[in-house]
């Protein structure tokens, strides 16, 4: 596709007058994102991303604004779109646009605009220079470049991918032989999956449902579909609010973990009729189907905290009961099924970003510090990598964790030489073998 089909648009946001509000929130978030701020201080003179043109497709939130400005502080040029139609915080997008950064994002995109916004990030400035790095969340940007703009691939040094779903897409490409550049899997860094996915969801899942519904969660029967890291955090979130939580699972290991964590583990069909809230966390498709909707009681709340909107069969719901749909407020809709009202949050998309503001700044600093280190590594050392999916090395995973300890008042013990020799590690780490499971 010719670059002439994408004329230069400096930015597109909902309301640029929100910039001052967004800037205040960004400054507040910076105080809670010690990893990113430490990288700015460490690399400000070295400028390790100088010359990089990073196209990013990741939720355009206040926390993401801190990531964007970190990449720029390290020398990069950046363009940005959001990876979800509902996840943009308009004040964050406005603040980034007001800072002279090309951002194309607003809350409530339709599918056509969503695609348009991603496309705008492929070329930089009035000179329309093409991207040479990708920072993705879910794989939509990556797929657009590879499938629709293959002529740009040769100039791209690599990509980093944020989330479970996007990583799955990358491994599918490796298997099919269609991944044309090296990729770093951010999601499975310990300091991402065991923190963002678990502790982030532990705080943001309940926050979203409360904001959307004003329900008293204590005593409510909640079904959490899936018990991976996201499911673990989500189940803990509702348990902490006093809910009675049941888990569904396909994996015997995760099911055993859930049972030993004190949750009942049941088939969805056996518990759905009594559920007050159902939340999907699996990253798979077709978890809540038409047959399940028909079993739900009046006023059941249904939502999803996986990346895409295909865990809940919204197509069936809209085809068969769309005429009954009533918008209660943005991202909260009521459908009537056989005389019973079913409440759908965020149209089945990410509830914590559709109905709230996502994970707290501190835990996102973990994830985004990983992203920044991955971009530095691929930009400077791409020749060392094949067109495969890689993990950040353990010493960098440990570095990300270490950068966040002082904020929490954590003090580390230090190994003596004889102790390090005894367990076969260096005094300064890494402290665990690659096969260690945290």
Curated annotation (Swiss-Prot):
Pfam families: AdoHcyase, AdoHcyase_NAD. Keywords: Cytoplasm, Hydrolase, NAD, One-carbon metabolism. Substrate binds at residues 61, 137, 162, 192, 196. The keyword Hydrolase applies. Binds 1 NAD(+) per subunit. Belongs to the adenosylhomocysteinase family. This is Adenosylhomocysteinase. The gene is ahcY.
């Amino acid at each position: 596709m010719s670059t002439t089909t994408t004329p230069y648009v400096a930015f597109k946001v909902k309301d640029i007058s929100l910039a001052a509000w967004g800037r205040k929130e960004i400054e507040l978030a910076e105080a809670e994102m010690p990893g990113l701020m430490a990288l700015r201080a460490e690399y400000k003179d070295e400028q390790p991303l100088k010359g990089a043109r990073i196209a990013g497709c990741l939720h355009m939130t206040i926390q993401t604004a801190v990531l964007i400005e970190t990449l720029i502080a390290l020398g990069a040029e950046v363009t940005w779109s959001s990876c979800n139609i509902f996840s943009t915080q308009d004040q964050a997008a406005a603040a980034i646009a007001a800072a002279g950064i090309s951002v194309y994002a607003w809350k409530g995109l339709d599918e056509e605009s969503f695609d348009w916004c991603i496309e705008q990030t492929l070329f930089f400035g009035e000179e329309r220079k093409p991207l040479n790095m990708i920072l993705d969340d879910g794989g939509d940007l990556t797929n657009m470049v590879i499938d629709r703009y293959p002529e740009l691939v040769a100039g791209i040094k690599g990509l980093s991918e944020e989330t479970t779903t996007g990583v799955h897409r990358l491994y599918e490409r490796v298997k099919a032989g269609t991944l044309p550049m090296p990729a770093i899997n951010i999601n499975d860094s310990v300091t991402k999956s065991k923190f963002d996915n678990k502790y982030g969801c532990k705080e943001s899942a309940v926050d979203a449902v409360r904001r959307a519904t004003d329900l008293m969660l204590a005593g409510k029967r909640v079904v959490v579909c899936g018990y991976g890291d996201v499911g673990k955090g989500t189940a803990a979130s509702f348990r902490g609010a006093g809910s009675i939580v049941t888990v569904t699972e396909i994996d015997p290991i995760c099911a055993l973990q859930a049972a030993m964590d004190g949750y009942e583990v049941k088939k969805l069909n056996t518990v759905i009729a009594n559920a007050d809230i159902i939340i999907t966390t699996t990253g798979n498709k077709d978890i809540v189907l038409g047959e399940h909707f028909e079993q739900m009681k009046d006023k059941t709340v249904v939502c999803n905290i996986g990346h895409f909107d295909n865990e809940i069969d919204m197509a069936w719901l809209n085809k068969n009961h769309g005429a009954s749909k009533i918008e209660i407020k943005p991202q909260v809709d009521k459908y009537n099924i056989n005389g019973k009202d079913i409440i759908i949050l965020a149209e089945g998309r990410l509830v914590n970003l559709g109905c709230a503001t996502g994970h707290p700044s501190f835990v996102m600093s973990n994830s985004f510090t990983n992203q920044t280190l991955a971009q530095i590594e691929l930009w400077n050392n791409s020749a060392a990598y094949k067109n495969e999916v890689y993990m950040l090395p353990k010493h960098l995973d440990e570095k990300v964790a270490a950068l966040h300890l002082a904020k929490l008042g954590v003090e580390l013990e230090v190994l003596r030489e004889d102790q390090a020799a005894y367990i076969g590690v260096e005094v300064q780490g890494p402290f665990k073998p690659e096969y260690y499971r945290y």
